[in-house]
């Protein structure tokens, strides 16, 4: 079924949607990527140092408003120590302003409970994180 006059407005609407969708950057600029990598590294260095109060400061503003620091610092284990070995930005969703990041760490128990755990030692682990760009700053997202 064809509606009268549909062609007059349908084509401009479709073209406008295509142009607006293409207008957003699909990739991060080098400056944005560097800023994100620095934030991820700084957060992980705070984790390595077990400065969980400082780690909390990298959480989104909404998260920090709803989850107080004094409770946040108790959600971490002291049974594992980490060494940051790398950060890689994997993907960026411009519409959602969300970046996917792979963080590579060496993970090792602080106390070896068996001969096997002592023999294995530190293990390489890749942790996938989501970071959200809000008001000109990258924030760690606990919601993904």
State each model region's role.
Residues 1, 35, 67, 71-73, ...:
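Low-complexity, intrinsically disordered short segments enriched for Gly/Pro and polybasic residues
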Residues 1-22:
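Sec-dependent bacterial lipoprotein signal peptides
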Residues 96-144:
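Exposed beta-sheet edge and beta->alpha loop/turn motif
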Residues 38, 52-102, 109:
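Short solvent-exposed beta->alpha transition segments
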Residues 22-51, 57:
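Short, low-complexity N-terminal intrinsically disordered segments enriched in polar/charged residues
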């Amino acid at each position: 079924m064809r509606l009268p006059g549909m062609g007059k407005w349908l084509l401009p609407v479709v073209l406008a949607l295509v142009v607006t969708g293409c207008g957003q950057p699909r990739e991060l600029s080098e400056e944005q990527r560097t800023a994100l990598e620095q934030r991820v590294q700084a957060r992980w260095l705070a984790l390595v140092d077990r400065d969980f109060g400082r780690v909390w400061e990298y959480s989104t503003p909404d998260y920090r408003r709803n989850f107080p620091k004094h409770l946040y610092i108790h959600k971490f284990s002291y049974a594992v120590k980490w060494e940051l070995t790398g950060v890689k930005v994997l993907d960026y969703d411009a519409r959602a302003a969300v970046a996917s990041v792979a963080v590579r760490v060496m993970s090792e128990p602080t106390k070896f409970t068996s001969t096997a755990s002592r023999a294995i030692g530190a293990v390489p682990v890749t942790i996938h994180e989501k970071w959200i760009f809000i008001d000109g700053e990258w924030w760690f997202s606990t919601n993904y």
